[in-house]
Amino acid sequence: MNNAFVIVDLDDFLTGEGRTRQIQIVKQAIEKRCFVRVRGHGFTHEGIDYAYEVVRRVFALGVEVLNKYVVPGNQVGYIGFGKEKADGAIYPDRKEFWQVYQPDQAETQTAKFYNIWPTDEVPEFEGVALDLFYRLQRVTQAMLRLTALAIGLPEEHFAEGTVGGSSIARIIHYPPVPDGAVGIRSEKHTDINHGTGLLTSQGGGLQLLDHSTGEWLPVEHDYDHIVFNWADMIQAATNGQVPSVMHRVVNPDDPELRSKPRFSIVFFLHPREEIVLEESSDIVKDNGPLTAHMFLWLRLWQIWLSDTRPAWYTGPDRAPQAIAV
C-alpha cells in the first residue's frame, strides 16, 4: 500500500458490492495514518472546471471588493490574506479564502451563522458553492460511515452526529509567491473537524507527513478522486484510535509555478455542537466534558480566527501572531 494514500470506491460501498473490501481498505488507511483517495464521488470533470472558473472570478474581484464580504467571527464570507496562522507556526499562511457555512443548521445550535454572497458581482457563485457543499458533505459522511464500521462501531455512529452540524466549505486562493516571500501557502497542521474532503486542486503542493518516517510525501490530485483525511475531532472522540493526519501546502520550487495562483475547494465535516468528544478532558476546568462546540472555538482561537480565549480552557496560551506576509 502506498504510504501517502489508499483508494476507496464509494460505489462499491454504497451499493453493497465489495462493501467488506472497502471497510477493510479504510481500516488499513487508519492504521497507516494516510490519506484516502475516494472514487465514485459524483462530480463530473465539466462541473469541477466550471466551479473553478466561477471561483477564479470571485477572487479576481480584488481585496477592496472582497472586504465588503468580511463577517465578524470568520465563519462565513471572505477571510483575508494572512489572517489564518497554524498553531505554533512562525508566519501566517499565504492564502485568502471564502467560507460557506452549513445551510441546514440544527435547531439546537446556539452559534448560528448565515452565508453571504457576492451576488452583484458574481451571481453564479451562490449556486455553485452550495452545490459543492452538499456534494462534498455526502462524500465525507459516507467516509465517516466506513470509518465507524472499520473500527467496529455502528454505521451511523459518527455520521448521524454531523447532520445539521457546523460543517464548512472553504474555497481557497493561494496567490503567486513573490521572490523573498516568507512563510508557505499552508503551514503543517491537522484539521479541526471529523473528516475533510478535498476536490481536485488547481496547482500542486499538498504534502502528507509519513508519521512512520518523518518524510513529507506529495499528494497528487485528479478529477476522478476526492482526497479525504481524518481530523482532530474524530481523533478525540475515538481516544486516538482514528488519528488525524498532518499535512501542509508548500510553495513551488519552479519559478514559473511560483508566479501562478493555486486554488482549492475543501470541505470540513463537523459534528453538531452538542456532541461530546471526551467525557472528561484535562484541558477543561474540573476535567469536565469536551464538546464539539468547545473544541471548535478553542482551535479557532489558537489559529487566530477568533479573538476570544475560551473561559473554560486550562491549557497554554496560543503562540503570538506573526508578522504579516
Model regions and ranges:
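Peripheral, non-catalytic segments flanking oxidoreductase cores
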Residues: 1-325
